Amino acid sequence: MSANNGVTGKLSSRVMNMKFMKFGKTDDEESSNSNTPSNINSDVEPIEQKGKLFGLDDSAWDLNSYKDDLKKISGKEKKKVKRVVYKKRPNLIISNVGYSELRKPEGVISGRKTFGDNSDDSGSRKRKFDEGEQNEDEKRDAKDKEFTGSQDDGEDEYDLDKLFKDSIKKKKTNHNGKNKNRNSKK
């Protein structure tokens, strides 16, 4: 390819901006070469006066000059902020993190509380009440066994299982008999 041919294809916006900046610089050089009276004096004038007359030219993309301008304007150099890096703590592993474990009321006495009573007395009362309930439950279980007779749990399960299987067999025989009747009617 020859150098005279233009660039074909799409150019990115950065490349296009660089091209325009290049053309802007060449235009400035050509205008400074002309012999107009304002341009003759412009070589002598400092940059600050140009900035006052024409405003700052933002087309120049020079970050260092921008920082220098900021230093001149503010009169102070900006301090660099030191970043403090904190070391991350190791993760704590907790074994019981379930909802019921987290919501467990610790030190809370469930039930009614009368004002003016000591908490120690109410705790001992509660323990006595719980023990009384357990004794009553044991007594009920003993009475139930006496009433029903001394059957073991294994025998009860065997009887229930046998009844269940018999009921399933009856349902199957009834269902098959109905299907035979329907087929014969058709």
Curated annotation (Swiss-Prot):
Modified residues (Phosphoserine): S42, S150
A Pfam entry, by short name: MPP6
Main location: nucleus
The organism's place on the tree of life at top rank: Eukaryota
Modified residues (N-acetylserine): S2
An annotated GO BP: nuclear polyadenylation-dependent CUT catabolic process
GO terms under cellular component: cytosol; nucleus
Phenotype of gene-disrupted mutants: Lethal in combination with the absence of either RRP6 or its cofactor RRP47. Weak but detectable stabilization of unspliced pre-mRNAs, and stronger stabilization is detected for mRNAs with defects in 3' cleavage and polyadenylation.
Low complexity bias spans: 32-42
One GO molecular-function entry: protein-containing complex binding
Region (Disordered): 22-47, 95-186
Compartment list: Nucleus
Record field: compositional bias (Basic and acidic residues): 122-147
Record's compositionally biased regions (Basic residues): 168-186
Keywords from the UniProt entry: Acetylation, Nucleus, Phosphoprotein, RNA-binding, rRNA processing
Family of the protein in this entry: Belongs to the MPP6 family.
Subunit structure: Associates with the RNA exosome complex.
Miscellaneous section: Present with 1350 molecules/cell in log phase SD medium.
Function: RNA-binding protein that associates with the RNA exosome complex. Involved in surveillance of pre-rRNAs and pre-mRNAs, and the degradation of cryptic non-coding RNAs (ncRNA) derived from intergenic regions and the ribosomal DNA spacer heterochromatin.
Protein name as it appears in the record: M-phase phosphoprotein 6 homolog
Species of origin: Saccharomyces cerevisiae (strain ATCC 204508 / S288c)
Recorded name of the encoding gene: MPP6
